[in-house]
């Protein structure tokens, strides 16, 4: 099954990181200017939503009509597992819009080529790798949110005002009415589980005790970060543990939902870009990475996510204040180091409620 392969490959990645396994990117740095091209064909792996990929590439093709982009789109966990499996013979030229926590695993395996696209100085320091020449560059951030269907809650004798925190999800009235993402296949699922464990004390049992209780109320774990929001919007569940943009977009379409950002703070991750370490770098890959952090691209990302990795200004529709204030203090290094154990333990405890693979 995909999720078992994903967990196994991520486990291997964590082991390689801890043992210092080298790869084809070790000691190599791409020319800062790159050998850009205005024509060619590249393969891009991404975990961006399908509709986002379509919109973003339409804009890219306006500027570079002679570059053909072959897209492989999967959820974060599947893309990460695929990149790990192909590490010694990478098929992708570029990774685009995939979780920074996954990039850190790949970076520790020397699977990423250090490269600094034009305009990288605009990217805030906390949103790109800390190496002198970055191995990955963030583009936007997404965060845990609860998407609650007010009509379904009313049937349970509840209102949206009663759900403000992680603890509120343990209400016995919600038993069988919550849908959440599987962290093995979904970046949203992993960032949420990681946040709970960090908020409850990282290496203590308190976080797992909470997840045990939450599991009692969960009807199903799905393999997409946005699917819980869509299921809440359609009335298939009362609460979808998803991410902000997914819920707000459903509300904008007229669904009877409210989007709740937990008062303890939201788990979060970055969508980031990277150049794959290969013996020969496709010049069009440099071109794509330059465009992917350009002002044009950032304007597109901002339409979907309130937090982009250049300086954020303006109003944030659907948020009470600056969304940066909603984010927990995320220990990415801890999350990457413990990813194998977290995923294995989660699978052992909760996988029985995961949806069947499509």
Language-model-derived ranges and their functions:
Residues 1-42, 354-358:
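Short, low-complexity disordered leader/linker segments with a strong preference
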Residues 36-104:
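Early extracytoplasmic/lumenal segment of secretory-pathway proteins
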Residues 46-54, 77, 91-233:
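Extracytoplasmic ligand-binding site segments that recognize negatively charged/polar headgroups
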Residues 101-105, 233, 237-256:
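A ligand-binding cleft/hinge motif common to bilobed small-molecule-binding domains
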Residues 147-152, 197-198, 269-281, 292, ...:
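A bilobed periplasmic-binding-protein/Venus flytrap-type ligand-binding module shared by bacterial periplasmic
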Residues 173-181, 210-214, 222, 253-277, 292-315:
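Periplasmic-binding protein-like
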Residues 328-358:
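Conserved C-terminal helix/tail region of periplasmic/extracytoplasmic solute-binding proteins
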């Amino acid at each position: 099954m995909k999720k078992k392969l994903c967990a196994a490959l991520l486990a291997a990645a964590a082991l390689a990181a801890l043992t210092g396994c080298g790869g084809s990117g070790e000691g190599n740095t791409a020319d800062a200017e790159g050998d850009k091209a205005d024509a060619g064909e590249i393969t891009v792996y991404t975990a961006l939503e399908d509709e986002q990929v379509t919109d973003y590439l339409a804009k890219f093709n306006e500027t570079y009509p002679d570059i053909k982009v072959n897209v492989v789109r999967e959820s974060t966990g599947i893309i990460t597992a695929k990149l790990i499996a192909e590490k010694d013979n990478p098929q992708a030229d570029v990774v685009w819009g995939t979780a920074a926590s996954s990039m850190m695993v790949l970076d520790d395996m020397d699977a990423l080529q250090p490269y600094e696209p034009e305009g990288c100085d605009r990217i805030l320091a906390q949103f790109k790798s800390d190496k002198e020449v970055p191995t990955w560059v963030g583009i936007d951030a997404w965060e845990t949110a609860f998407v609650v269907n007010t009509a379904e809650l009313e049937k349970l004798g509840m209102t949206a005002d009663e759900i403000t925190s992680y603890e509120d999800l343990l209400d016995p009235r919600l038993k069988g009415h919550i849908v959440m993402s599987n962290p093995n296949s979904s970046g949203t699922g992993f960032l949420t589980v990681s946040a709970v464990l960090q908020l409850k004390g990282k290496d203590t049992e308190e976080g797992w005790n909470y997840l045990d209780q939450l599991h009692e109320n969960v009807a199903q774990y799905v393999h997409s970060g946005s699917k819980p929001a869509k299921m809440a919007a359609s009335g298939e569940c009362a609460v979808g543990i998803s991410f902000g943009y997914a819920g707000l977009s459903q509300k904008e379409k007229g669904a009877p939902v409210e989007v709740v950002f937990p008062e303890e703070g939201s788990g979060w991750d970055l969508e980031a870009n990277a150049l794959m370490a290969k013996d020969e770098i496709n010049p069009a890959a440099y071109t794509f990475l330059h465009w992917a952090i350009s002002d044009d691209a950032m304007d597109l990302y901002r339409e979907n996510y309130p937090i982009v990795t250049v300086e954020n200004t303006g109003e944030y529709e659907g948020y009470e204040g600056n969304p940066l204030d909603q984010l927990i203090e995320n220990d990415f290094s801890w999350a990457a180091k413990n990813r194998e154990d977290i995923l294995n333990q989660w699978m052992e405890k909760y996988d029985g409620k995961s949806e069947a693979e499509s």
